[in-house]
Structures are given as structure tokens and as C-alpha cells.
Amino acid sequence: MAQKICTQITEFILVELMDRQDLKMPLFAAFLSIYIFTAIGNLGLILIIRTDTRLSTPMYFFLSNLAFVDFCYTSVITPKMLGNFLYQQNVISFNACAAQLGSFLTFMTAECLLLASTAYDSYSFLVALFHATLTFCLCYCHFNIINHFYCDDMPLLRLTCSDTHAKQLWVFACAGIMFLSSLLIVFISYVFIISAILRMRSAEGRCKAFSTCGSHMLAVTIFYGTLVFMYLQPSSHHSLDTDKMASVFYTVTIPMLSPLICSLRNKEVKEALKKAVSRSSQASVFVKLQK
């Protein structure tokens, strides 16, 4: 059997989200608007929770951490994706690709654990670091075009000429354990939540509680659903073009929706937001009067 020649790859070329040139600028404007909205929503939520003493509870501490993780992991992907719409050749260095994959996996793992109300930060960091190290210790051959808009595992594995069996087993084992354990915690939590809601005597209270829980379950379903669709299916069934579209949901859409779904439907957060806006308006009026 002929031995495959392993060459030193110093950079990769990222494939655009869509090949149509006429959609480049509309997509750039759309994703830039989403990213700005995501940054304002998540960072604003953190600021409101940190400055309002009424929100100094474990639940809002959890929400502020979730908002921080949402902002971080979309910031790992979106700025580079926006740049790809503007440049003719979307080049990313080998080290930058490794850093992007490692950072993204770290924040994505933290997101899964936070959604299950778990905070194993050191565990998520070590798993993501080992995961990325396994990927970039593989031997990459002549081709360096990644069929994705960011550095992701499955497209990178298509480029390697090494045996990926051990790596794929690691991906399925880690993803399976993490997803299933997180989903089990979420499921058990909702069994108790629904049981408590059904014991409520007020019909209005039940409707309000189901509305809040339904919003959270929508976010959980979209997030876990896209991850399961992408990472827990056999490689023979993988379509990278379909994966690219699915990954937009959890890299761009979910971080934008999280502050709306998890917080702005909450009465206490709404009141804190109104109070912050009122203070800001009063401060601006005072500054104008001083002038």
C-alpha cells in the first residue's frame, strides 16, 4: 500500500456560506445587524444584572454567565464570517484555525452545561482543549480548503490523510455523554417544573409559567437539536452544505435570541431595564442643563 505524503499546511481557505455573489452584501448587512443586536442584548443584560441589587440572586447570576458565554462563542465565529463576505480569498492561518476551534468548543461546552444549570468550567476547558489538540495533531495533506465558514471538526477531518477512527470515537463519546447528561438534567428539571405548575390553583399563573418555560424549551430544543443533527450522525450521512446552514442557528441565531427568551419576558428584568433607561435619560437631561 502506497504511503500517503504528509505536507506541512500553514493556512486554510474557508468556503463562503453561499456561492452567490449578489447575496454577499445583503448577508453581510444582515449578519452584522444580528451580531450588533447580540452584543447589545447580552452585554446589556449582564450590565443590568450587575447594577440592579434586586437581581442579586443565583438565577440571575446564572443568566449573566449564560449571556457572557453566548456573546463569547458568537464572537469567536461571527467577526471572521463577516470578513469572509468582504474578501476575495478567505484565508485563515493554521494556528488561528486551531485557536478558533478550541475557543469555540470551550464556549459551546460551557453553554451546554449552563443550560443544564451546571458550571464545570475546568472540565469544559480541558475537554475542548484535548478535542482541538487531537484534531490539529492529525496529518493534513495537499488540500487546505475547508468547506465551512469557520474551523469546525467535521470539515477539517475531510482534509486529513491520517486515520480518523480514534478521533471520531472521541467526538461521539464526548458529545454523547455531554449532550445526554445535559438533556437528562433538563428533562428531570422540567418534570418537577411541570408538576409544580399543574399544582397551581391560578389559571393565569399556570399560563404565565408555561409561557416562560416554553420559551426556554424553544431555545434548548434549537440549540441541542442543531448540535445533535451535526455531530451525532454517522459520517456517511453528513452533508457539509446542510451542516453550514444548520450551524448558523447555534453560532448566530441562538446567542441573539437568548437574552430575549430567557430574560426580557421576565417582569423583574423588564423593570430593571426601565429603571436603567430612566436613569440614563435623567443623566442626559442633567448634562444638557449643565451646558
Where is each model-derived feature located?
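Transmembrane helical core of 7TM receptor-like proteins
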Residues: M1-K291
